[in-house]
C-alpha cells in the first residue's frame, strides 16, 4: 500500500471577514505502515492538518494525493463511546453488520487487554480503558490509515505511558499506518517513526527515527540531542 502525499497544501479560515492562513504550503509524505507524528504547540495547525488528510475538512490550495482511496478511522481526544452500548458493541459501532469480522474483533479486544471487560459499559471503565476501546474500534474498521488527535492527552502520566506501550504493541501486531497528533516531545520520540514539527502553520523540520520503539532510550545522548533540537525548532524557552 502506498502512503499519502501533500503538495503545497494551504488552509484558510475567515474570522470577522479577515482571512487567516492556518496552514501554509505544506509538503509532506506520510509513509504506509509507519507511525507519523505531527508535533507542535497548541494552535499551530496540527488538528487542522489531520482533518484535511482524513477528509473531514477541505483544503484551499494544493493537492493531497492518495487519501481518497484509503479506508480511514479516527481516534479523538475524547473517547466518544456510546454509554448504552457494551465494549464489543462500541467497538463494532458504525461497521455494517455484514462487514463485521467477529473473529478479528475478538482478537482486537484481547490485544488491547479488554477480554475480561467484553460486556462492560463505559461507566464501568477507567479513562485508559475507554481509550483502549476507542483504539480497538479504529482497528476493527480494518483501516489503511488511523488518524489520532492527541488521544492520550487527558490521561494521567502513568496511564499515558501505558497507553503508548499498548499502541506500539497493537501497531506491531496488526500493522496499520497511523498519523498521530501531539504537543508532547517525549511522546513523539517514543511513538514516531517520522516526526513532523509544525510551527505557525508551516513545517519547521522533519525527523526520521530508525530505532525500533522498544529499543529507544530517551536518556540516550542521541535522543537528548534530538529533543534539544526539536525544542530549538519550536523556540521553546
Task: Explain the meaning of each model-derived region.
Residues 146-149:
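Catalytic Walker B motif of ABC-type/P-loop ATPase nucleotide-binding domains
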Residues 54:
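Helix-to-loop junction immediately C-terminal to a conserved catalytic motif
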Residues 135:
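Hydrophobic anchor residue at the start of the ABC signature
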Residues 121-125, 129:
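Conserved ABC ATPase signature
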Residues 100-117, 169:
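Conserved ABC ATPase "signature" region
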Residues 140-144:
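A short, proline-enriched helix->beta-strand linker immediately N-terminal to the Walker B motif
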Amino acid at each position: 500500500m502506498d502512503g499519502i502525499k501533500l503538495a503545497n497544501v494551504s488552509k484558510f479560515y475567515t474570522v470577522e471577514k479577515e482571512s487567516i492562513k492556518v496552514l501554509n504550503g505544506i509538503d509532506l509524505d506520510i509513509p504506509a505502515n509507519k507511525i507519523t507524528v505531527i508535533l507542535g504547540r497548541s494552535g499551530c495547525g496540527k488538528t487542522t492538518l489531520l482533518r484535511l488528510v482524513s477528509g473531514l475538512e477541505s483544503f484551499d490550495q494544493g493537492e493531497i494525493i492518495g487519501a481518497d482511496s484509503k479506508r480511514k478511522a479516527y481516534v479523538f481526544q475524547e473517547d466518544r463511546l456510546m454509554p448504552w452500548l457494551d465494549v464489543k458493541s462500541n467497538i463494532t459501532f458504525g461497521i455494517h453488520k455484514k462487514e463485521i469480522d467477529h473473529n478479528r474483533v475478538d482478537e482486537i479486544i484481547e490485544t488491547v487487554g479488554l477480554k475480561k471487560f467484553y460486556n462492560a459499559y463505559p461507566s464501568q471503565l477507567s479513562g485508559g480503558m475507554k481509550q483502549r476501546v476507542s483504539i480497538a474500534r479504529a482497528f476493527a474498521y480494518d483501516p489503511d490509515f488511523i488518524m489520532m488527535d492527541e488521544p492520550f492527552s487527558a490521561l494521567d502520566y502513568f496511564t499515558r505511558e501505558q497507553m503508548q506501550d499498548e499502541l506500539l504493541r497493537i501497531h506491531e501486531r496488526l500493522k496499520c499506518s497511523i498519523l498521530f497528533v501531539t504537543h508532547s516531545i517525549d511522546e513523539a520520540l517514543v511513538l514516531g517513526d517520522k516526526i513532523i514539527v509544525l510551527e505557525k502553520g508551516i513545517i519547521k523540520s522533519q525527523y526520521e527515527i530508525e530505532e525500533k520503539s522498544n529499543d529507544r532510550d530517551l536518556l540516550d545522548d542521541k535522543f537528548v540531542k534530538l529533543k534539544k533540537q526539536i525544542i530549538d525548532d519550536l523556540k521553546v524557552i
